[in-house]
Amino acid sequence: LAVYAAAMNFSIFDISLVTFMLAISGAISQYPVGYISDKFDRRKVIIYSTFGAAIFAFFAIFSVGTMYLPDGLGSSKFWFYIFLIAFSVCSLPMFSLILAHTNDFITRDKFVAAGASLQFAFGLGAISGPFLCSLLMDLIGNNGFFVFLIIFHCLIGVFAVYRMKIRPSEENPDSQFVAVPTTITPVGMELNPTTEPIEEPEKI
């Protein structure tokens, strides 16, 4: 992002500002996006987030293009900052969403291995992404930065739609939740065959 901002003739202050806004908005968005993903199907949240990020990246391209129009016609950087923040809110929680979705389909003893594998894949993307993005920027211009992000997020969104069609949502295999009335007694809980036995305290 800093390289893109420098190529677009942003000042040093503007470059530091967009970098700060991208990081802080992405960090804050972890909480509301995580809460929403706990209430609804995570794959739907991933789909909305990826396509939302792609849409806001497109708007960012448009807003940057209007900033360099003649006086009286051009827009300020305000809208670019707004679209950048909206993009960050949709994009940066993606790793957490995918990790949480993965944990929904595996047992608890595989959480660490799954997290390590996803972190490795994330690292490969962090290494190859800037290189591939720079090639696209050299090919089509500075806006290749956001074009690359649009393509990348759309691919994730399309894959999520594909997975939703071939695999239904299921509960966590470690979950032992059973819906019971509020008036149930402790005896009713003990009669549930899926409830783990509770050890009686030793008498002194």
PLM regions and their residue ranges:
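Intrinsic disorder in cytosolic terminal tails and internal cytosolic loops
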Residues: 163-204
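Loop-to-transmembrane helix entry/capping segments in MFS-fold secondary transporters
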Residues: 12-13, 106-118
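C-terminal ends and interior cores of transmembrane alpha-helices
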Residues: 52-73
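Short amphipathic helix-loop junctions that connect adjacent transmembrane helices
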Residues: 1-14
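Structural signature of the two symmetry-related core transmembrane helices
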Residues: 44-59, 150
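Helix-to-loop junctions at the C-terminal end of transmembrane segments
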Residues: 29-41, 137-138
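Intracellular juxtamembrane helix-capping segments at the cytosolic ends
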Residues: 92-106
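A membrane-interface helix-boundary motif in multi-pass transporters
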Residues: 135-153
